[in-house]
Amino acid sequence: MVDGRGNAYVNTIGFDFPGGQFAPGIIALVTPDGAVRQVADGVAFPNGMVVTPDNATLILAESYGNRLTAFDIAADGSLAHRRTWADLVGGYPDGICLDAEGAIWYADVPNQRCVRVREGGAVLQTVDLDRGCFACMLGGVDNQTLFMVAATWDGPASMAGEQRTGLVLSIVAPAPGAGWPSHG
């Protein structure tokens, strides 16, 4: 994920998926000059990331942690003051996107849905699907269309199958996209 300053944040899950023994992952920072350094560790299957429009906060989906985690971003791109942005009891956040009201949409594969939450975890809206939701992004002409990437998910073994069940679905969202990755 590239922020408004040109910094790229890259995460790794920390173990071989599927089938490997769980181990926490990391977030690495790649600066515009090509320097690379680790800026966070101990994250539980890190997935989607967003940065607020002011480039002050990075929010990470921790799929195995059932939460969205926030970090303050320093001027040099370092991450500090780790905290839970939203505890998603029973939710497994995958891809995420941020809207102009400060809410986050998260894709949830095993629960076959895309959910909009505010900081603290209050659920604002749920879009139930008939298959797993892997990614979401706000875009379109007015940046107010929520696009959802969904496919049938029968566990890790289904990744090697010949099924062709993927769809891109969309709805009109209550607020336009904001922050990074760029939605426009």
Spans of model-derived segments:
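Beta-rich, blade/repeat-based domains predominating
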Residues: 1-8, 24-26, 36-57, 87-103, ...
